[in-house]
């Protein structure tokens, strides 16, 4: 079981609850973070979170997680479709991660169909609304082991 999880939310996710609620729902980012924190607490998992609209800030936080975090749950937002830098950071720190998207990116505009992260992710969850975060944490808790322990 993962003992520590870093939740990363990328650009524009600070607008959850007000930005295009017909696509992203009415749940706010503080509600998502509180729910994730409570879930991790129930599972005895150390939880941390960052949201930034700046790619470099997210990359720096991923670098800081190296050796300190067992798993990353990431909703990269629009960086999904554009950021080789984010991909390289995740691969470079060798921390297993689960990619989350609130909407089903494959039912949206064609430019949203490609992810620079998916082929490196342990799992990809999309289209489940904010429940996707809960599912990602549950997956990480059950299937991602701390370094040095055998993976399932």
Swiss-Prot record:
Entry annotation: catalytic residues: 24 (proton acceptor), 101 (proton donor)
Biological or metabolic pathway of the protein: Aromatic compound metabolism; 3,4-dihydroxybenzoate biosynthesis; 3,4-dihydroxybenzoate from 3-dehydroquinate: step 1/2
Lineage, highest ranks first: Eukaryota, Fungi, Dikarya, Ascomycota, Pezizomycotina
Name the record gives this protein: Catabolic 3-dehydroquinase
Enzyme Commission numbers on file: 4.2.1.10
Gene Ontology terms for molecular function: 3-dehydroquinate dehydratase activity
InterPro entries for this protein: DHquinase_II, DHquinase_II_CS, DHquinase_II_sf
Binding residues for substrate: 75, 81, 88, 102-103, 112
Catalytic activity: 3-dehydroquinate = 3-dehydroshikimate + H2O
Gene transcribed to yield this protein: qutE
Similarity section: Belongs to the type-II 3-dehydroquinase family.
Source superkingdom: Eukaryota
Keyword Lyase: yes
Swiss-Prot/TrEMBL GO biological process terms: 3,4-dihydroxybenzoate biosynthetic process; quinate catabolic process
């Amino acid at each position: 079981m993962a003992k520590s999880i870093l939740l990363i939310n990328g650009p524009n996710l600070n607008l959850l609850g007000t930005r295009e609620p017909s696509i992203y729902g009415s749940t706010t980012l503080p509600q998502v973070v509180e729910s994730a924190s409570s879930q991790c607490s129930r599972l005895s998992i150390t939880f941390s979170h960052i949201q930034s609209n700046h790619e470099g800030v997210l990359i720096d936080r991923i670098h800081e997680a190296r050796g300190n975090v067992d798993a990353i749950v990431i909703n990269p937002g629009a960086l999904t479709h554009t950021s080789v830098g984010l991909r390289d950071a995740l691969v470079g720190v060798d921390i297993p991660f689960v990619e989350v998207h609130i909407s089903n990116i494959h039912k949206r505009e064609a430019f949203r169909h490609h992810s620079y992260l998916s082929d490196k992710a342990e799992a990809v969850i999309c289209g489940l609304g904010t429940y996707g975060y809960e599912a990602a944490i549950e997956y990480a808790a059950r299937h991602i082991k701390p370094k040095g322990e055998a993976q399932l």
